[in-house]
Amino acid sequence: METDAPQPGLASPDSPHDPCKMFIGGLSWQTTQEGLREYFGQFGEVKECLVMRDPLTKRSRGFGFVTFMDQAGVDKVLAQSRHELDSKTIDPKVAFPRRAQPKMVTRTKKIFVGGLSVNTTVEDVKHYFEQFGKVDDAMLMFDKTTNRHRGFGFVTFESEDIVEKVCEIHFHEINNKMVECKKAQPKEVMSPTGSARGRSRVMPYGMDAFMLGIGMLGYPGFQATTYASRSYTGLAPGYTYQFPEFRVERTPLPSAPVLPELTAIPLTAYGPMAAAAAAAAVVRGTGSHPWTMAPPPGSTPSRTGGFLGTTSPGPMAELYGAANQDSGVSSYISAASPAPSTGFGHSLGGPLIATAFTNGYH
């Protein structure tokens, strides 16, 4: 007889793996615990049987668990290619306990600093943050190819209280440039499914605040938050073009022909919307397409690898921290920061190196 007692079928995060326990998916809504036990009893002695039900409606959720007295029952079930119960094909599998989901770090000694200007050095960063408390370490992430930093880094303080004080002021001014400071988060928090290991997009903190534009760097176990795309206004807001081999060219389009004047019937005769649409379609005099993204005088030239100008958020979905890097750097990841406003740019092909403040610990 089924009861309304708490259902222990879903293992707690710390539950050890039981090789005799099976997950049974695809159950019919009519399948009962007794029916489930009776069916799997033909494969071995059943120690425990459970059909998972909605706590409010008490309806079956379409799956359950069966635990055998020994592993031989599990082996017999798996040896049979097809199982059918209550006129429905079911899917028995070995059950594994759920892993504990990592929690967001609220107390840490490490912060991520993004948006540093090109002329900012690691000593400048350390000197600035020393006003809040003792700095144990400061680091900027560098490109090996150009030997220039990419506009962001990490600072480690003596205590968590200093970090709280720093992060209360979200934006700080270093070398006449506003930079953003955030608590560094373990990469497991930002990508609990392990997508940070590859090129999958990681969407930390929700889509409303942070979109795409993720540059993955190697820094042991931490990932900082990403920035919304702030590329050229002619592009779709919130998006960047993240193809490393794709070159974004801003080339004027061929001159458009001047359309003849339509005077036979007033455009307003078709309604205001039709008149507005027709007027927008007529290009007069200049001979250029109104959507052409011609570079303004003195602007930064186009870049390869998804870098879209000086207001771009930085590296786009490129994986850094390769195996040939320092082992102390390669196991952490961080996200892109806004490119410095001075207009320098780097290719994204080269690996990164880190420069650290020498403080007797390195």
UniProtKB/Swiss-Prot annotation:
| Domain RRM: residue ranges | 20-110, 109-186
Q: Which UniProt keywords apply?
A: Acetylation, Cytoplasm, Nucleus, Phosphoprotein, Repeat, RNA-binding
| Matching PROSITE patterns | RRM (PS50102)
Name the InterPro entries on file: MSI_RRM2, Nucleotide-bd_a/b_plait_sf, RBD_domain_sf, RRM_dom
Q: Tell me which tissues or organs this protein is expressed in.
A: Expressed in stem and progenitor cells in the subventricular zone of the hippocampus (at protein level). Detected throughout the hippocampus. Detected in astrocytes, ependymal cells and in the anterior subventricular zone. Detected in proliferating cells.
Q: Which GO terms describe its cellular component?
A: cytoplasm; nucleus
Induction annotation: Up-regulated in the CA1 region of the hippocampus after ischemia.
Q: Which Pfam families does the entry mention?
A: RRM_1
In its UniProt record, a GO molecular function of this protein is: single-stranded RNA binding
* Modification sites for N-acetylmethionine: 1
One Gene Ontology biological process = central nervous system development
* Phosphoserine modified-residue sites: 191
Compartments, as annotated in UniProt: Cytoplasm; Nucleus
Indicate yes or no for the key word Hydrolase. Answer: no
Gene3D superfamilies for this protein: 3.30.70.330
> What's this protein's function?
RNA binding protein that regulates the expression of target mRNAs at the translation level. Regulates expression of the NOTCH1 antagonist NUMB. Binds RNA containing the sequence 5'-GUUAGUUAGUUAGUU-3' and other sequences containing the pattern 5'-[GA]U(1-3)AGU-3'. May play a role in the proliferation and maintenance of stem cells in the central nervous system.
Domain text from the record?
Answer: The first RNA recognition motif binds more strongly to RNA compared to the second one.
User: What's this protein's name?
Assistant: RNA-binding protein Musashi homolog 1
Which species does this protein come from? Answer: Rattus norvegicus
Q: Which gene encodes it?
A: Msi1
